[in-house]
Amino acid sequence: PDIFDIKMFSPDELLNSGSSLVYYYGYDIHGNKLTSNPTLKDFFEKQDSDGNYLREIASFQPIYTAGYIQDKFAIDDLIFNIGLRVDRYDANQKVLSDKYLLHQAYTVGESTDFLNNADIPSTIGNGYVVYVDDASNPSAIVGYRDNETWYNADGLQISDPLLVAEAAGGQIQPYLVDPEGASAGEVKVDQVFEDYEPETIFMPRIAFSFPISDEAQFFAHYDVLTQRPPQSNRLEPVDYLFMADRV
């Protein structure tokens, strides 16, 4: 009936705590095309006059750049065709600075009462991320991480980070700077996200040919080919908003 309208529901009601009733980007949650280009920070923080989060998601606007040069020349009967294609791809969006952290976490070299009183193994560097038994009220360190390399509480390298999770009661818990904010679902975009780093690919192409008889020629070529990333590499802010409910 006409008396019902989707605008009766706030964005968070339509997102339904992670069991989303709508899917959108480039439009607002009620299906109206956006006239602005909201940032990722806007998605997590921007509110309307009634205090409802707008949850606006910008359209996906990757930047593709490509160039090609080619030259053909001959040396006696040997004909060369040489070229170079350069492709540059910029997803033009934010990505996590550390793919394992949605909230800022302490590293070994930072000074807190908890870390100052901790017994840190000699194999652990100052830049290693600290994992604890309880993110809200840590009492013991259960592991460390250096990029993709994980260590247990004794500083021994481990191949399975689930061992760190088991030591924390079944869930990996980094030593968070703001555990209260993380528990409330706050995401500090400026602290944990960064701009996507554009990728540049160089693709040489070399071909040559020469006659091997009056009626036949020999041809050979070498080239490097790449494929542009698919649309599926678009960042999905809703996934991060409800990550705790979806894992």
Model-flagged regions — what are they?
Residues 14, 18-20, 49, 53-54:
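Polybasic, low-complexity Lys/Arg-rich tracts in intrinsically disordered regions
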Residues 24:
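N-terminal, post-signal-peptide metal-ligating segments of extracellular/periplasmic oxidoreductases
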Residues 28-39:
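Conserved oxyanion/phosphate-binding beta-strand-loop segments in alpha/beta enzyme cores
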Residues 2-12, 16-17, 30, 58-247:
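Structural signature of Gram-negative outer-membrane beta-barrels, strongest in the C-terminal barrel
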